[in-house]
């Protein structure tokens, strides 16, 4: 079998096709075969409020990317936001957590558009790194220099929303239907 070798949990596997879809870590993984994906990572946060009276059914977002989110069917709001503190974050540190400082930056942006949420209690927050290609366009393609290698990365935090379509596209690529 001619294909790619890869290591997982100390074991070596061989496959005709390997998909690298590991967010920002895709850059690290592909460097092992001489491919450098022009990308970076940035920190995004999310929060959930306590239940609120029904306000609207649409997804919200701002052109400046201050925040995005929606009201769930049971009434809580789920928002993602940029803390605005990106420059002060140590990008070598992987165990980032939201704090009262970073979460409040996102809350101020949200309250600027939805003042009725000023007194809403936040019940949960979390954050994590998102991958971003320098041109803002995700990579979903074969790598000519490494036959059998397919990349799917650089989704700028939109991976969950695009996952069904991307999964179908990747399965078609693996099956040779692209």
Question: What does each model-found stretch correspond to?
Answer:
Residues 24-25, 108, 165:
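Alpha-helix/helix-capping structural signal
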Residues 11-56:
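Central helical "cap/lid" subdomain
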Residues 1-4:
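A conserved short coil-to-beta-strand element within the FAD-binding core of flavoproteins
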Residues 37-39, 119, 177-178:
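A short alpha-helix-loop-beta-strand transition element characteristic
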Residues 51-149:
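Active-site lid/adjacent beta-loop-alpha segment flanking the redox-cofactor pocket in flavoenzymes
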Residues 8-10, 64:
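Glycine-centered tight beta-turn/hairpin loop motif at sheet-sheet or coil-to-beta transitions
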Residues 144-178:
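C-terminal lid/capping helical subdomain adjacent to the catalytic/cofactor pocket in oxidative enzymes
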């Amino acid at each position: 079998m001619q294909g790619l070798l890869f290591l997982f949990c100390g074991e070596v596997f061989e496959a005709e096709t390997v998909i690298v879809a590991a967010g920002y870590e895709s850059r690290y993984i592909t460097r092992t075969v001489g491919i450098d994906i022009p990308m970076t990572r940035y920190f995004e946060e999310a929060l959930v409020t306590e239940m609120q009276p029904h306000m609207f059914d649409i997804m919200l977002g701002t052109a400046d990317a201050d925040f995005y989110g929606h009201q769930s069917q049971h009434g809580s709001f789920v928002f993602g936001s940029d803390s605005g503190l990106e420059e002060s974050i140590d990008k070598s540190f992987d165990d980032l957590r939201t704090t009262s400082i970073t979460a409040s930056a996102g809350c101020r942006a949200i309250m600027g558009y939805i003042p009725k949420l000023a007194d809403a209690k936040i019940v949960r927050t979390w954050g994590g790194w998102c991958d971003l290609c320098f041109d803002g366009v995700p990579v979903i393609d074969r790598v000519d220099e490494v036959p059998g290698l397919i990349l799917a990365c650089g989704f700028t935090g939109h991976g969950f929303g695009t996952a069904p379509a991307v999964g179908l596209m990747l399965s078609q690529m693996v099956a040779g239907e692209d």
